[in-house]
Swiss-Prot record:
HAMAP family cross-referenced by the UniProt entry: NusB (MF_00073)
A Pfam cross-reference name: NusB
Coiled coil: none
Organism name: Syntrophomonas wolfei subsp. wolfei (strain DSM 2245B / Goettingen)
GO BP annotation list: DNA-templated transcription termination; transcription antitermination
Keyword Repeat among UniProt keywords: no
Domain of life, source organism: Bacteria
Family: Belongs to the NusB family.
Mitochondrion is among the record's keywords: no
Protein keywords: RNA-binding, Transcription, Transcription antitermination, Transcription regulation
Any one cellular-component term (Gene Ontology): cytosol
Protein name: Transcription antitermination protein NusB
One function term, GO molecular function aspect: RNA binding
Length: 134
């Protein structure tokens, strides 16, 4: 559960940056205190945030290529930002287990998204993992 909280915090920060151009570090610092993110998971969460924001253009291209029915700017901002964080973890974090990252993203999507969010996020992330694995 602790890494889920770290992933959830990363999603919340990336979402805030996307929606209101929030300062990522300030948003992260606030959420660490507000959500009581354990110190041992703060580094992981911050790595997800920084990496996602740094690689966002590449990640967005990949998400867009697999979501043909939904343009990136037309899809739910919750779904979009959950997928960004999970895609970063799948593609760029060597010590990450992709299947776990996808499962966690689905659970976060069910919590914050709408009825179809979990399925949509799962479908796109499965395609991204498939491309990575060739």
């Amino acid at each position: 559960m602790s890494r889920r909280k770290a992933r959830e915090t990363a999603f919340k920060v990336v979402f805030q940056v996307d929606q209101v151009q929030a300062d990522a570090k300030k948003a992260f610092d606030y959420l660490v205190l507000h959500d009581k993110l354990a110190e041992k998971n703060q580094g992981f969460s911050w790595d997800l945030i920084q990496g996602t924001l740094e690689k966002q253009a590449e990640i967005d291209q990949m998400i867009a290529s697999y979501s043909r029915e939904w343009a990136l700017d037309r899809m739910s901002s919750v779904d979009r930002n959950i997928m960004r964080v999970a895609a970063y973890e799948i593609l760029y974090l060597e010590d990450s287990q992709a299947v776990v990252a996808i499962d966690e993203a689905i659970e976060i999507a069910k919590k914050y998204g709408d009825e179809g969010s979990g399925s949509f996020v799962n479908a796109i992330l499965d395609k991204i993992l498939g491309e990575k694995n060739g």
